[in-house]
Amino acid sequence: VALLGSSADETALKLKGKDATTVILMMGLQGSGKTTASHKLAYRLKKEGRNVLLVACDLVRPAAIEQLCILGEKVGVPVFTIPGEKNPSVVASKAIEKAKRELYDTVIIDTSGRMHLDDALMEEIQNLAKVTNPDEKLFVADAMTGQSAVDIAKEFDEKVGITGVILTKFDSDTRGGAALSL
C-alpha cells in the first residue's frame, strides 16, 4: 500500500551505525501508549543487536518512571533517570551524554503527554527536540482516537516535525480508527 510506504527504506527507522548514537524521541498525548511503545521498540532493537538506553522523561504522570523501569528490566534494557529532576530536557541531555560515554548506540526518550494538546506540552516537546536533536521523532497515537488523531498529528508535525507514526492498541477496535487517516 503506497500510503504506508512503498519500500522498506520509506518505513524503516533511520538508525546510525553502531559507532554513533541514534536518538529517538517518542511523542503523543497522554494514554496513547508511548511508554509501552518505547519499551517494545527498545526490545526489538536489542534483539537486532543494538545497545539501547531508555530515558524516562515523563516527569508529569505519577508512576511513569517506575513503569518504564519495570518494563526496561523485563526486556533487559537499562533506563536512565535522575530522581527529583523536574526538567525533562536536563534528563534527556544527561542521558545522551551517558549514552555517548558508555557506547550506547540507541537512545529512546519516553516523554510526557497531556489529555489534550496544550502550549505547555508543545513547549516541552519542542525543548526536548532542540536539546536532543533526535534522528527520529515518532508520533504515538491510539488507533481508536479516530479522525482527531490527524489533527493532533498535524499539530505535532508543525511544531516539532514527525518522522514516523506508531499506532497502539490496534487490537482493541475492529474499525482501526486512525490507521488510514494517519
Predicted regions and their residues:
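Conserved phosphate-handling catalytic cores of large alpha/beta enzymes
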Residues: 104, 116, 122-130, 134-182
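Conserved phosphate-coordination/catalytic loops
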Residues: 86-90, 119, 147
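Alpha-helix termini
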Residues: 41-46, 89, 123-126, 159
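G-domain G4 guanine-recognition motif of GTPases
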Residues: 30, 55-60, 82-84, 111-113, ...
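Conserved D-loop-proximal element of ABC-family nucleotide-binding domains
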Residues: 62-65, 117-119
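Short alpha-helix boundary/capping motifs
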Residues: 35, 61-62, 89, 146, ...
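Primarily NTPase-proximal linker/entry elements flanking Walker-type ATP/GTP-binding cores
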Residues: 1-57, 64-84, 91-101, 105-111
